[in-house]
Regions:
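Hot-dog-fold acyl-thioester-processing enzymes
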Residues: 2-67, 113-115, 121-203
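HotDog/MaoC-like acyl-thioester-processing domains
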Residues: 3-4, 9-16, 73-157, 208, ...
Length: 248
């Protein structure tokens, strides 16, 4: 067992620097939104490990965090090769879930922010109460907000874009299901208007209803809503996975 010890000296928010690699940028030379979400996953783990809560700690107790909702706002241009300072902090919680907020800084300016709402589950996938050790190590208020939701209107009269595909092996993470950042890429791939996908500023909102697994056949339906786009992602057998929006 890894001891957490006295963490009263831990800085808030936690900070880490990331350099945007060549393969993390799009054809416009700017960081992908999914890259920012991957950075946020990584810094959350680094933060947790620094306070004594590594993967072994969670495995020993049979619990794990899963993302239930995410919001990614790109406010400025982040080019390939740039080094951004990313922050993370737990800004609110309830019995079984917590929200992290991250901000991305480039040359001292905020160029993006990300909210991730995490639920704690046990080995059966059932919601689990947050252990008191975590409450003590990550002091934060009882949330006066709800887990993120994405309400979608019915498909507009304009033609919807629909395509099907299968989950590829490289899209899986150590938990054995599709990494939550991959859904951001899939949302962008559903939108035929490149100017929407590359618009700055823009904001992504995703609600995760279920997780896709190895080899699953998926069906994505996307449609325009003014200058923004909505998407429903479901299994080929009909179960809903994701409700998402890209807003500009």
């Amino acid at each position: 067992m890894t001891e957490t010890g006295d963490q009263s000296h831990a800085p808030r928010p936690f900070r880490h620097t990331y350099r945007v690699r060549f393969d993390e940028a799009g054809v416009d030379g700017l960081v992908r939104a999914s890259t920012l979400l991957r950075y946020v996953q990584d810094i959350a783990w680094v933060h947790s490990e620094r306070l004594g809560f590594d993967r072994a700690w969670y495995a020993e107790r049979g619990v794990a965090w899963l993302v239930r909702a995410a919001e990614v706002a790109i406010l400025g241009r982040i080019p390939m090769g740039a080094s951004i300072e990313l922050t993370t902090d737990v800004v609110g919680h309830r019995k079984v879930w917590a929200r992290r907020r991250s901000e991305a800084f480039l040359d001292g300016e905020v160029v993006g922010w990300i909210h991730t709402d995490w639920v704690l589950v046990d080995r059966r996938g059932t919601l689990a109460r947050i252990p008191p050790e975590i409450d003590a190590a990550f002091p934060n208020p009882i949330a006066d907000f709800q887990v993120g939701r994405v309400e979608l209107a019915e498909v507009a009269s304009q033609p919807a874009v629909e395509h099907s595909f299968r989950v590829r092996r490289h899209e899986l993470d150590p938990n054995g299901h599709v990494n939550n950042a991959a859904y951001v890429d899939w949302l962008e791939e559903s939108i035929p208007d490149e100017s929407v996908v590359r618009h700055v500023p823009r904001r992504y909102r995703l609600e995760y209803a279920a997780a896709a697994g190895p080899g699953d056949e998926l069906v994505a339906t996307a449609w325009p809503d003014g200058s923004s786009w909505s998407q429903r992602l479901r299994l080929g057998t009909g179960g809903e996975l994701i409700r998402a929006r890209l807003e500009v």
